Amino acid sequence: MFTAFKRFCVFLLAAVVLFPVGSASADVSLPAPQRTGGSGVFDALGSRASAVGADFASMKDVSLENLSTVLWAATGLNRGEKGWTVPMAMGMEPYVKIYVARADGTFLYDWRAHALKEVSKEDVRGRVGKQDFVAKAPCTLIFVSDSAALSKKFKDDDGEEFAAVAAGAMTQNVYLASGALGIGTRYIRSARDDAIERILSLRDDDDVLCIMPMGVKPGA
């Protein structure tokens, strides 16, 4: 007959087996994005620029507060529960996903919850870009078409054009928000697509659209 102590030991062992330490996901709840203030839209357009590749090595990490604002600018809700910061065809929900590669892991931006959902604890920044400077950036955004969302309205590859157009609007918003926050970034179409597909375990019909390495400029 088990004593109370033996029962406790069995329970503890089962807990360790079923829920090992370190197995829990590390999702990140983002702070509220900045929606007011900053420079005017014409100032932001006037200063929009791509960061020089060599500068990424000296950039600092992007805070969660600033990352929150950049991601919201890219594809966040701005008018209650139905309305985004970028146009989507036929009133659809966003059909381009944004993954965030950081030193502490890789995450998927959840626009509904305005949160980062952990995909991997691995630092993959050095494996997503073809240029050496991408690996030195504190953070990289990865834009991927969402084939599951696109299939609700489009057949075959028709939706890919819409995904590319949406990614264009999203990346421009990233540029403008980043510029207002003192963040340097760069749009890059040429990425290690095959490696990214494996790292993120993408669906067969999901396509890597572009990447944007980023970091806080020195002195910002």
Predicted regions and their residues:
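Bacterial N-terminal signal peptides that target proteins for export
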Residues: M1-L12
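Small-aliphatic-rich amphipathic alpha-helix that forms the alpha element of a beta-alpha
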Residues: R48, V70, I98, C139-L150, ...
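Solvent-exposed loop/turn segments at secondary-structure junctions
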Residues: G76-N78, G105, S147-L150, P218
